[in-house]
Design a protein with these regions (language model features):
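Small-residue-rich segments of transmembrane alpha-helices in multi-pass membrane proteins
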Residues: 62, 67-74, 120-136, 185-193
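Transmembrane helix-loop boundary segments of multi-pass membrane transporters
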Residues: 1, 19, 78-101, 114-119, ...
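Intrinsically disordered, low-complexity non-transmembrane regions of multi-pass membrane transporters
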Residues: 50-58, 170-198
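Transmembrane alpha-helix boundary signature
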Residues: 2-12, 38-43
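Helix-loop-helix junctions within the multi-pass membrane cores of secondary transporters/permeases
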Residues: 27-104
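A cytosolic-side transmembrane-helix exit/cap motif
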Residues: 4-9, 108-120, 170-179
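Hydrophobic alpha-helical transmembrane segments in multi-pass integral membrane proteins
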Residues: 2, 77-78, 128-145
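Membrane-helix cytosolic exit motif
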Residues: 151, 155-180
Length: 198
């Protein structure tokens, strides 16, 4: 199924876009494919539902799905940029993982755990069987070195959810703190308004 279906199709689409005379289209088209390919990963659906159940709805499946889709979208966009420019993958991977590690100091451990699980889930069968051949097809059509320019897309897809999920957690935590502060202020105002009669 993989050899007859996804891999050749991915390679043909990648090569076709690269050969059309507007190679820069690889970036936006790749990002759109990356955004929607997350929905085709079976493990993603299992993970998002489990996270929603374990967190008692605090982290919804929709939030998780969106964060993962955005992460993969960005990673595929960067991978296509690399194919067009030949920039080393290390310029993205090292700062990306450093940033992900820094975020672990400021984000709740539950979000950190979810983020690191999500990295493995997002880089599942669809990434290996469609996105990688897509990148290889584009790279070959542009005359690039497949061994250096096309590879690294799976590593990028595994890295970006670490950042996007933890960023989602950080924003959620900030919202919760702001909500608590607002409630505290309202409670103080109510206490000030109470009149006591002897």
């Amino acid at each position: 199924g993989v050899n007859v279906g996804f891999m050749p199709v991915g390679q043909i689409i990648g090569a076709g876009i690269a050969d059309c005379g507007y190679a820069w289209l690889l970036i936006p088209i790749g990002m759109v494919i990356g955004y929607f390919i997350v929905a085709a990963e079976p493990a993603v659906h299992v993970l998002t539902k489990q996270v929603e159940e374990i967190s008692n709805g605090f982290v919804t499946a929709k939030m998780m799905q969106t964060a993962l889709s955005v992460g993969v979208c960005i990673s595929v966009g960067i991978a296509m940029l690399r194919i067009l420019t030949g920039i080393s993958v290390l310029w993205f991977l090292i700062p990306g993982y450093v940033f992900a590690l820094v975020l672990t100091r400021y984000v709740s451990p539950i979000f950190t755990g979810i983020a690191y699980d999500s990295g493995g889930v997002a880089s599942g069968p669809m990434t290996a069987t469609f996105l990688l051949p897509f990148a290889m097809g584009a790279c070959e059509a542009l005359g690039g070195n497949v061994m250096t320019d096309a590879f690294g897309i799976v590593a990028m897809v595994a890295m970006t959810p670490l950042i996007t999920i933890q960023m989602m957690g950080f924003i959620t935590q900030m919202k919760e703190k702001a909500k608590r502060r607002y409630i505290e202020v309202q409670m103080h105002q109510l206490e000030d308004d109470i009149l006591y009669f002897d």
